[in-house]
Amino acid sequence: MLIDCGDESIRTTLNKLDITKIVTVLFTHHHRDNVAGITDVADAGTEIGVPESERQYFENVEDFWSDPKHRWHLYNYRPHNLMLAKSVKVAKTYKNGNHMFFGNAKITVKETPGHTDASVSYLIEVDGNRVIFSGDLIYDEGQIWDLYSLQKGDWGTDYHGFLGDRKRLATSLDLLKGESPSLLVPTHGNIISDPFLAIDTLMKRIDLCYDRYLAISALRHYAPDFFPYYADKDDHMPIRSGKKIPSFLRHFGTTWIVISENRQAFVMDCGSTQVIREIEKLQELGEISEITELWVTHYHDDHVDAIPEFQNRFSCYTRTDSIVAQVIESPEAYRIPCISPAVVNVNHRTDDGESWEWNEFKMTAFHFPGQTYYHGGLLVEGQDLKLFFSGDSFTMAGIDDYCSGNRNWLGNNTGFDRCLRLVDELKPSHIFNCHVNCAFDFTDQQIEFMLTNLSEREVLYRKLFPWDHPNYGMDEHWVSCYPYEQRVSSGEQVELKVKFTNHSNAPRIATCQPSLPKLWQTIVTSRSIEIQPNTTDEICFFIDIPKDIQKNKRIVIPVDMSYNGRPLGQFREAIFVT
């Protein structure tokens, strides 16, 4: 019997142990890096058992991969795209309290959601021992494998649910403690000989991490009533009052408009056709004449969905940060939160710190990796004012980092640390958020408070994850396939890149190998690369598409990988569309 089976390396282990037959495989949850090895060890007689509520994520994965809601406008994390590429047949399903026997071992199923909505643990009682196979609830004493799997919304979508499943995780871990296990055996992680200490340490760390997150969270502005138990805490930053906006600005939806003295308009973002209607009304009223420029703050769908129609309606020059442009010009190449299929025509990709004149205003663009890594900031100087348009990165309550998939990095001059230092240097008279009607600003003391908070988090999260830098546990997309999705034709050769971000302070070796469908009868040789510290590099593969490939199919190409000797399994995937 096996419990979980993450990758093909299990076959080597079985051979060393002279095990030739696998009778049963029990799975704690459906994630591919926990399951994909099953195709290398199972035969027709192997009985596969899974959590009852996750059966569809084993037996019917094709529905997941073909459903557009799991590809575009991604606001939910459950189920996660760490899904098998191809369905497997399930023999049995299990729910809380089910018992089974294997030899003289009694196995009891415990429903332990947290890492996924329906993950289970298995209590093994044999020879007087009580051992729990706990899936990915815990990695080691005080540690978890990653943070982003706990993204879960208490209200609305999962997008706003940073560490949102920490309560269910705590309940599940308390349940395990109540079973008085002698050992915990995680799927990713080390065998834990003191479960009580390991669990208590983990939950104390998670609670402290959440408190530090909330202390400067922009979400407190949008939903102040949701956090009453954190009100008036001395170590939480007070929420600042708003400021009146200058008379030459207009705000509709997520769009800010600057109107010059000659009545020309400079528009930022267009997430809804209603914005186009509002601009047409301003033209009818004579408040503005023509739209001459469009600035795109970031790639999220509520900021770009209507840009193609906007560009058809108004003949204007479109600018955006060069890193933002990578996404909005080729959205099919990415699978990241709030991604829109809308393709934006960008006339000019701005460099960090690049300036230009627009009527009486001086515009200066910055790469501004705040709410998301793919984000720009714009300083507008004129009429004796310094206005900073921060996209969605700030509110008067603090920073917008409540979706772990947005790539909010920790570190000096990185992520929000970089953004806050830039604002401190520029000292704008007004700061603007695309979702907030009024302006605001930060005091020097508030900026220092937020910078200190981020430094504290870096130390806290380093303890929480089994990595040498916390960004590996926080940045879900530190490894990605590029393009994520591409159209392929029979008989052609296509390129697939696997990109790795080395968050460490020393070089790291990355190794990977795409896993092609067995019917293709093609094996791609694994490749490795040394990645320099604090850089992103890529491994390129050229893949031959079979001449007899079926048309109108979405083919999932998982990529097996390791990082500096640590096996990650089929950690990422790409999509080929025929």
Predicted regions and their residues:
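Metallo-beta-lactamase
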Residues: 2, 99-102, 106-197, 201, ...
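Short, acidic/polar linear motifs in exposed loop/turn regions
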Residues: 272, 502-507, 547-549, 565
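Terminal connector regions
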Residues: 548-578
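Short, surface-exposed loop/turn segments at beta-strand-coil junctions that are enriched for proline
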Residues: 530, 544-551
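Accessory terminal helices/loops
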Residues: 147-256, 262, 417-511, 523, ...
